[in-house]
């Protein structure tokens, strides 16, 4: 549960409670699929069954709230990472004006200045030196992603 924020856990609790109509403290695997689809998660029935089997620690065939949160977290975190990658790809594309698959280190300096205007020229040079390992003066998308993800 550490990987989700309070708001996400609260939303999951509401969904869980609204489907646990008898207040038994668990929901069925079918219900899990319904909730995930309502949250916009696309998952095949086969994958859903596999994930439920992995998550159903006590083997009851039903999911208690903690098990449900653990299962849902896998999808919510994956979705966030995918969204971030899409945003970074779009940012890279905007700065890759010629569409040749790379940006120059000068363009990277511009991006870094926009992200943090407190960076000195020395800071920028140090960052560039670290990310442009081959000294080519350019960064392709993978190098850019590596830098942005730390």
Curated annotation (Swiss-Prot):
GO terms, molecular function: calcium ion binding
Binding site for Ca(2+) 1: 56, 58, 60, 62, 67
Domain spans labelled EF-hand: 7-42, 43-78, 83-118, 119-150
Keywords (A to Z) from UniProt: Acetylation, Calcium, Metal-binding, Muscle protein, Repeat
Disulfide bridge map: none
N-acetylmethionine: residues carrying this PTM: 1
Binding site for Ca(2+) 2: 132, 134, 136, 138, 143
Gene Ontology cellular component list: myosin II complex
Stored SUPFAM superfamilies: EF-hand (SSF47473)
Family classification: Belongs to the troponin C family.
Note: There are three different troponin C in lobster.
Stated role: Troponin is the central regulatory protein of striated muscle contraction. Tn consists of three components: Tn-I which is the inhibitor of actomyosin ATPase, Tn-T which contains the binding site for tropomyosin and Tn-C. The binding of calcium to Tn-C abolishes the inhibitory action of Tn on actin filaments.
The protein's name: Troponin C, isoform 2A
Source organism (scientific name): Homarus americanus
């Amino acid at each position: 549960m550490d990987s989700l924020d309070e708001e996400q856990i609260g939303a999951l609790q509401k969904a869980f409670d609204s489907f646990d109509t008898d207040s038994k403290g668990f929901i069925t695997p079918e219900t899990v699929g319904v909730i995930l689809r309502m949250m916009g998660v696309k998952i095949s029935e086969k994958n859903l069954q596999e994930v439920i089997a992995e998550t159903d620690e006590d083997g009851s065939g039903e999911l208690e709230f903690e098990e449900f949160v653990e299962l849902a977290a896998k999808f919510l975190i994956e979705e966030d990472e995918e969204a971030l990658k899409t945003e970074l790809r779009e940012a890279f594309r905007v700065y890759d004006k010629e569409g040749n698959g790379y940006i120059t280190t000068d363009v990277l300096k511009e991006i870094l200045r926009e992200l943090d205007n407190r960076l000195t020229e020395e800071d920028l040079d140090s960052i560039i030196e670290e990310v442009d390992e081959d000294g080519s003066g350019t960064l392709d998308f993978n190098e850019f992603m590596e830098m942005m993800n730390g």
